[in-house]
A protein has these predicted regions:
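Class I S-adenosyl-L-methionine-dependent methyltransferase catalytic core
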Residues: 1-125
């Protein structure tokens, strides 16, 4: 579905968990993936998975609150072609994080965002 957007892309995997989404993007040709999760345990798992898959050189991992990580990316003037958001279920972080990404100017002009959300919540359609 998003294969064309992945190749050579700068990817953000926010609320990365075990890193599976970002690692999949790297395996399909993404140039670089920035992983963020606030859980130290998740960050350890992501680091292990990157080592196992051989994608360490194409990855950057931060372990911080999502808003802090996004602010740090803005200071570095990063732009993302593909944003993967898989937040904790029913916490409202889906909308908040996507709005913050837009407000901070982190999305490239043709950015694609893929966001996991509650099936009953269709409000993201309007962002």
């Amino acid at each position: 579905m998003i294969q064309e957007e992945i190749y050579a892309a700068s990817v953000l995997d926010l609320f990365a968990g075990n890193g599976a989404l970002g690692i999949e993007a790297l395996s399909r040709g993404a140039a670089k993936c920035y992983f963020n999760d606030k859980s130290r345990k998740c960050c350890e798992v992501i680091r292990e998975n990157l080592n196992r898959t051989g994608f360490t050189a194409a990855a950057e991992l931060s372990c911080a609150e999502y808003s802090e990580a996004l602010s740090a990316y803005q200071k570095r003037r990063l732009k993302f072609n593909l944003v993967l958001i898989d937040p904790p279920y029913r916490k409202g972080f889906d909308r908040e994080s996507l709005e913050l990404i837009c407000r901070l100017g982190l999305a490239s002009p043709n950015c694609t965002a893929v966001c996991e959300h509650d099936a009953q919540d269709l409000s993201l359609i309007h962002i």
